[in-house]
Amino acid sequence: ILGNGTEYINDDETILIDFNTNNIEWTSENRNVVGVRVLLTYSEDETSNGAGCAAPGASQPDPDTITGTVTHDDFNGTTSGQNQGQGSSSHEILVEWYNSSLYFSGNATNMSESEIKNELDSDGAGLGLYFLEINVEAESNDQLGCNHTDNDEEVEYSVEVVLLNYEITPA
C-alpha cells in the first residue's frame, strides 16, 4: 500500500495528497511497479429539516459527485462517482503502463525476449512520487418546506501500486 486515510472535503474543494514509493516497506525484491490503483469510498451526510420533509421524496438527498485524479510522471487517470443516498459508495481509478493484454494472454508468439521485457517491465518508471487529487461537488436542493444542508463529504482513500511478476519461458 502506498497510502490510505480519510479526508473531510468541503463542497467545491480539491485536496492534493502526495505519496512516494520510497516510503513503502517492500516485502520482496520485486520493484516492477506497472500501475497504480486508487479506491475512493464515501457516503451521504446530507441533512434535511422542516415540516415539508414528511412529503414523499422531499427529504431524499441529492447525489454528490466525488472525483479522483491520480498522477505519476506522465501517467494519470481521472474517475468520478456519486453517492447514492443510504450506505456507502465507491469507485476505483486504475492506471497501468504495461501491456496487460500480452501478460494475460500468456502468449508472446513472434516476439524476442527483449521485446517481451519492453512490454512488461517498467524499468523503474513506477518508482517515485504519486499525487492524488480528490474533489467534492456536494448537491443539496431544497424542497417546499424542506431545507437541505450538504457542505462536505468524508472520503476514504486507499492507494496501491500494481506490481507485476513474470517469467519468460521458451515454447
Residue spans for each PLM region:
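N-terminal leader/pro-regions and domain N-caps
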Residues: I1-I9
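Hydrophobic transmembrane signal anchors and adjacent membrane-proximal interface regions, especially
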Residues: E7, H91-V95, L102-G106, N118, ...
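Acidic, Ser/Thr/Pro-rich low-complexity intrinsically disordered segments
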Residues: I9-N99, G126-L127, V136
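Intrinsically disordered, low-complexity regions
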Residues: T14-L16, T21-N23, P63, E113, ...
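Signal that preferentially marks extracellular ectodomain short beta-strand elements
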Residues: N22-E25, Y103-G124
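C-terminal edge strands of extracellular/lumenal beta-sandwich accessory domains
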Residues: G57, E119-A171
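Generic secretory/membrane-interface signal
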Residues: S90-I93, S112-E115, L144-H148
